[in-house]
Curated annotation (Swiss-Prot):
Function: Involved in the heme and chlorophyll biosynthesis. Catalyzes the aerobic oxidative decarboxylation of propionate groups of rings A and B of coproporphyrinogen-III to yield the vinyl groups in protoporphyrinogen-IX.
Catalytic residues identified in the record: 118
Pfam families noted in UniProt: Coprogen_oxidas
Top-level taxonomy: Bacteria, Bacillati, Cyanobacteriota, Cyanophyceae, Acaryochloridales
Protein name: Oxygen-dependent coproporphyrinogen-III oxidase
Pathway in which the depicted protein is active: Porphyrin-containing compound metabolism; protoporphyrin-IX biosynthesis; protoporphyrinogen-IX from coproporphyrinogen-III (O2 route): step 1/1
Main localisation: cytoplasm
Required cofactor(s): a divalent metal cation
GO cellular-component term (any): cytoplasm
Span of the signal peptide: none
A Gene Ontology molecular function term of the record: protein homodimerization activity
Amino acid sequence: MTVATSASTAVPSDSRQRVATFLKDLQDQICQGLEAADGGAQFQEDTWQRPEGGGGRSRVMKNGQLLEQGGVNFSEVWGEQLPPSILAQRPEAAGYGFYATGTSMVLHPRNPYVPTVHLNYRYFEAGPVWWFGGGADLTPYYPFAEDAKHFHQVHQAACDRHHREYYPVFKRWCDEYFYLKHRGETRGVGGIFFDYQDGSDRELYRGPNPDGEAARYSQRVGSIGSRSWEDLFAFIQSCGQAFLEAYLPIVERRRHLTYGDRERQFQLYRRGRYVEFNLVYDRGTIFGLQTNGRTESILMSLPPLVRWEYGYTPEPNSREAELYSTFLKPQDWVNWPV
């Protein structure tokens, strides 16, 4: 049985159950892979209920050999009142109750040579309106081009299994989304990011910046035709299941590199950018706070230790300076020579 929608596509009657089951399985898969990589610490699970409807399970690892702190969350919430952040983007959802489910993850490694990483995949329904969103992005503290290239190549391969224009559009969208306007720099080397993918016969880019590189590229591509709910569900499954392949080889290359106080202090300083982005710009944080989500779970993305320094500038010709000059601006990482 299927339910017709305004996007001239059809949603299976068991859509919510199927997506939630996949996202919980993804949480399990990622946690098991990270526990095996850490070799000692385990995730502690905290289940919670939302009074207005729904709940979730938060899993956090602290003080591991690999992770100083990391969290992998699953949530499934519903309610009658749509948050303003959703209505601003999809006003046609007004007047309907909503359902939202997602798995989100942020890992803050101990060694400054191991990059921080973020993942989120989600699904939303409100009456006739539905869409998938998500992505994954990498935030290194020290510049290793082969790591950025590997992370992008794995996600490009996952995208290409479904459409060859997914990666070029969603890579540009990621560069645009994870950008700190007040700092004039990207959060890291990016990855993929997409939202409002509902299968309608429209351009792939559906973000807020019609003049950006993502929009311009998407306009050149034009419509790729309508896609079914099943097509898009298969796509986010491929992306989610690509994460461990994209991240763990980087971890193994960097986790045993020797570092000192200089590298640690720079890591803590750069973590400040993560805090700034998540509290000022991040759509998931804003949505969670507007829908009375669980604050501890929403703010799980923040690092355990961080510092700010007035007027910091990296030493010329240093590895830190290379991060700023090359790794905090959009690059064609898939084709980067290494």
